[in-house]
Design a protein with these regions (language model features):
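Short, structured coil segments at secondary-structure junctions
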Residues: 65, 94, 114-116, 171, ...
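Adenosine-phosphate binding glycine-rich loop
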Residues: 264-312
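Glycine-rich phosphate/diphosphate-binding loop of Rossmann-like nucleotide-binding domains
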Residues: 48-60, 141-225, 231-233
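Phosphate-coordination loops involved in phosphoryl transfer and adenosine-cofactor binding
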Residues: 37-43, 146-148, 172, 264
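Phosphate/diphosphate ligand-binding glycine-rich loop within oxidoreductases
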Residues: 36-140, 275
Length: 312
């Protein structure tokens, strides 16, 4: 018996990830079949970052499988006070599975190294695996397979890293990355070079104009964007100058009607959206159902992840 955690996709084979996606599809189609699948199981959710989708999807997800959840904010916990390893080990004595949405990747790694129950990374500075499983589920539903062309335009961040990791691992479809902005993550050149070597990640010139990028967009199935400013900084006065500099640099890369004109692609965004910044209101209006399908699929993907980890 080897207990699995999901910090990112490193510990999973392509077949295992496909099994999770197929299970998620079945759970979505036949919820009654799984209504007691995790009876009596206890999920602990810990939030250092703000959340709408991660909180709702995990808590409704475990409930739909017959389990219960216990939610705590990082600032209200004693993780902020003392030696964290003993706190982690204590939590594990009370619950069956843990999901934490944390600011730093190193804190997620600390959990991964010390838990005695399965642990899920609900998002950190470097990876967002559950979001990408929801994206993959949505791709399968809308296109029938993972063999799609996806163009990501925006910051090289946790969502982008996990997208690249997923496409490279699955060896299906291709992600084209236009990332003029690089956020602070642990994924260095080796990570991206290895992904490029699979042929399933194409790094576009980050100085490319949107006119040039538009030529690529015409052939895409999906155009994907994400916030340019991390959500914990968006309304932070101390971050005001850096935010303004970032927005000024990135405004030419907005996903708007002019850019999407002539492309058959649907638009993905992992939410929350900042209309008028990374995406225009018109593009949101046209693609809102796709974006909401993507967001709803967080719940189904995470149900499959929890079930898989608890039965690994």
């Amino acid at each position: 018996f080897v207990m699995k955690n999901m910090l990112n996709f490193k510990n999973f084979t392509a077949d295992e990830l496909m099994d999770i996606l197929n299970l998620a599809l079945d759970m979505k189609k036949n919820p009654e079949k799984y209504a007691h699948a995790l009876d009596g199981k206890k999920l602990y959710t810990l939030f250092e970052k703000t959340s709408t989708r991660t909180f709702l999807s995990f808590t409704t997800g475990i409930t739909e499988l017959g389990g219960t959840y216990y939610n705590q904010l990082w600032k209200d916990s004693n993780f902020t006070l003392g030696e964290p390893v003993s706190e982690i080990k204590y939590v594990c004595r009370n619950v069956d599975i843990i999901m934490a949405r944390l600011v730093k990747n190193e804190t997620v790694e600390l959990f991964g190294d010390n838990v005695t129950v399965p642990f899920i990374n609900g998002c950190d500075s470097s990876y967002h695996p559950c979001q990408i499983l929801a994206d993959a589920l949505t791709i399968i539903e809308k296109f029938g397979s993972l063999d799609v062309k996806l163009m990501y335009i925006g910051a090289k961040n946790n969502v982008f890293n996990s997208l690249v990791e997923f496409f490279a691992k699955m060896k299906r479809g291709t992600i084209y990355g236009l990332t003029p902005l690089v956020n602070n993550t642990v994924c260095g050149d080796d990570f991206f070079e290895a992904a490029k070597a699979t042929g399933h990640y194409v790094e576009l010139d980050p100085t490319m104009s949107m006119e040039e990028a538009k030529k690529y967009a015409k052939d895409m199935d999906i155009l994907y964007t994400d916030t340019w400013v991390d959500m914990e900084f968006f309304n932070n006065p101390a971050y005001k100058q850096q935010k303004e500099e970032t927005l000024a640099k990135m405004m030419p890369y907005q996903l708007n009607e002019e850019f999407t004109e002539g492309s058959k692609a649907i638009v993905f965004h992992d939410m929350p959206m900042h209309q008028g910044f990374e995406i225009s209101q018109g593009v949101i209006d046209k693609n809102l159902n796709h974006i909401l399908d993507e967001a709803e699929n967080r719940r189904h993907a995470e149900k499959a992840v929890m079930y898989t980890l608890l039965n690994s």
